[in-house]
């Protein structure tokens, strides 16, 4: 999403550089050659015309899936736009280019085991790339957390990851999560997506 400040500056420049209507008086000393005004308008049209058509996807975790993290679109503010598709729980990249890829999961639990030597609980979340260039899933983003031994009462741990990658048309983005039983599945806490830059 474009920050609001980035929208106002090009709009203001376009208004300032636009030629005045016939017969209108401009500010003294603020005349620009007609070619400069035309170039500014063309740049604005190019910027705003293409920015709305960039591929974007935002998926949320499916709370009905108990034994795996399944992604869903077209619900709870989730969407697939301008070429992205979801197939076999993977995002299919519609065109080659730079993409910001991101994901978040939130884990929760009632507490650690009260045993003298509690069993460690490891939580992990990874975004993977499957491409025609590789014969296996390549980790793009990876994070781990260890909870036990630790809190005696309820606990919550969140993992957010995001970075820019050069992706190729047809690449598949998927996730792998350890600690599925501890996922706190809600649209605002468990999500996965990508958008073209």
UniProtKB/Swiss-Prot annotation:
Its main location: secreted. Residues 55-197 form the THD domain. This is Lymphotoxin-alpha. Gene3D superfamilies: 2.60.120.40. Glycans are attached at residue 88. InterPro entries: TNF (IPR006053), TNF_beta (IPR002960), TNF_CS (IPR021184), TNF_dom (IPR006052), Tumour_necrosis_fac-like_dom (IPR008983). It is found in: Secreted; Membrane. Residues 1-26 form the signal peptide. Homotrimer, and heterotrimer of either two LTB and one LTA subunits or (less prevalent) two LTA and one LTB subunits. Interacts with TNFRSF14. Cytokine that in its homotrimeric form binds to TNFRSF1A/TNFR1, TNFRSF1B/TNFBR and TNFRSF14/HVEM. In its heterotrimeric form with LTB binds to TNFRSF3/LTBR. Lymphotoxin is produced by lymphocytes and is cytotoxic for a wide range of tumor cells in vitro and in vivo. Belongs to the tumor necrosis factor family. One of its GO terms (cellular component) is extracellular space. Disulfide bonds join 112-148. Pfam families: TNF. GO terms for biological process: defense response to Gram-positive bacterium; humoral immune response; lymph node development; positive regulation of canonical NF-kappaB signal transduction; positive regulation of chronic inflammatory response to antigenic stimulus; positive regulation of extrinsic apoptotic signaling pathway; positive regulation of humoral immune response mediated by circulating immunoglobulin; positive regulation of type II interferon production. PANTHER family: LYMPHOTOXIN-ALPHA (PTHR11471:SF31), TUMOR NECROSIS FACTOR FAMILY MEMBER (PTHR11471). It comes from the Eukaryota. Keywords: Cytokine, Disulfide bond, Glycoprotein, Membrane, Secreted, Signal. GO terms for molecular function: cytokine activity; tumor necrosis factor receptor binding. The gene is LTA.
């Amino acid at each position: 999403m474009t920050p609001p400040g980035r929208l106002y500056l090009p709009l203001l420049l376009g208004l300032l550089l636009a030629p005045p209507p016939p017969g209108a008086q401009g500010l003294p000393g603020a005349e620009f050659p007609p070619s400069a005004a035309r170039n500014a308008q063309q740049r604005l049209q190019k910027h705003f015309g293409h920015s709305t058509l960039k591929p974007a996807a935002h998926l949320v975790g499916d709370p009905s899936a108990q034994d795996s993290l399944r992604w869903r679109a077209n619900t709870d503010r989730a969407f697939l736009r301008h070429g992205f598709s979801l197939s076999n729980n993977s995002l299919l990249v519609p065109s080659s280019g730079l993409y910001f890829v991101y994901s978040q999961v939130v884990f929760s639990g009632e507490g650690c085991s009260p045993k003298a030597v509690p069993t460690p609980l490891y939580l992990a979340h990874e975004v993977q790339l499957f491409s025609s260039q590789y014969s296996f899933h390549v980790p793009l983003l990876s994070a781990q957390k260890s909870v036990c031994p630790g809190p005696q009462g309820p606990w919550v741990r969140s993992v957010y990851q995001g970075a820019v990658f050069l992706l190729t048309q047809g690449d598949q983005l998927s996730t792998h999560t350890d600690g599925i039983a501890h996922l706190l599945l809600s649209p605002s806490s468990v999500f996965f997506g990508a958008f073209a830059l």
